[in-house]
Amino acid sequence: PFIKVPIAKAKIYFKQKDKFKVESKGIAILPKQGMSDLTGFLSNEKKYSAVLGEAKTINEHKTRLISILPTDENSEIILAKVYISTSEDLIYRTVLTTKSSGTVSIDYEYNLNKKYGLPNKMTFTVDIKKFKMPKSVASDIRNNDKQKKYKDNEKGTIVLTFSNYLVNKGISDDVFKKD
């Protein structure tokens, strides 16, 4: 395994359209790609073209693929594949290919907050060789694991489980200011 991080509890704040913040007392490793990149990318319809694709069943949900291509050649996102339920209008999988971090696949599971389109679980699969770690964590790993060479196709998994959602409660912009 690349790194096994103990389970961490965190508070995640999100405010439309592009404000995102994580507060955690321990180590919380989140993929930069996927959490807010797709939301920001999709917020401007002039920045991409979308093409309807194949039907595919994901975890017993019938979905349709929408391939999203940037119109800006300098976009960090090269391709976004979004699998959306045909009956619920929920995303069940996204596959983001980026210039700097390779491919990140995200599977979504829903329960109580399904009506808001908010998942209770997200499972990220990342390219280990291209995944960007925080510098302090990456430094420790490199010092402890100098002999390990990661293959081009080696994958890592990050699982986020969400609970205690507070929806539409209003968040001050001050929450998102850097300390």
What are these regions (language model features)?
Residues 3-90, 98-102, 176-178:
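Flexible, processing/modification-adjacent segments and terminal tails
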Residues 62-174:
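Gly/Pro-enriched, hydrophobic low-complexity segments
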